[in-house]
């Protein structure tokens, strides 16, 4: 799953340094500006805006996510996205054009409904 092969990706090797004991990378997807990593325990991504100088690495445990929404490409808006809603904040992530969001939805549903 994911657009990167977890075992071969240099991005995966960088992310492995951020993992805790017993945590493993399940999939990595390309975002419009960066990437998002789904592990067996949480989601890791940068919360940044394209023109902002600040990049904040976000570690979001699945248990903190209250709901999510998938934004599909439309006729006049080719971007696809994901909204992750927590009690305190909503994160809006824009994916690369060729990302299969049904895969992303399946990964999230697996973790949130179990």
Swiss-Prot record:
Signal peptide: none annotated. It comes from the Bacteria. CDD domains: PH-like_bacteria. InterPro entries: PHb, PHb_sf. Pfam families: bPH_1 (PF08000). This is Uncharacterized protein YozO.
């Amino acid at each position: 799953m994911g657009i990167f092969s977890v075992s071969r990706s240099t991005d995966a090797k960088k992310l492995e340094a951020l993992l805790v004991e017993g945590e493993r990378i399940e999939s990595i997807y390309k975002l419009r500006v960066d990437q998002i990593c789904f592990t067996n325990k949480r989601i890791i991504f940068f919360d940044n805006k394209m023109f902002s100088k600040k990049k904040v690495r976000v570690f979001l445990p699945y248990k903190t996510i209250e709901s999510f929404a998938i934004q599909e490409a439309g006729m006049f808006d080719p971007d696809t996205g994901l909204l992750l809603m927590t009690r305190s904040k909503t994160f809006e992530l824009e994916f690369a054009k060729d990302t299969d969001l049904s895969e992303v939805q399946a990964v999230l549903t697996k973790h949130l409904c179990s």
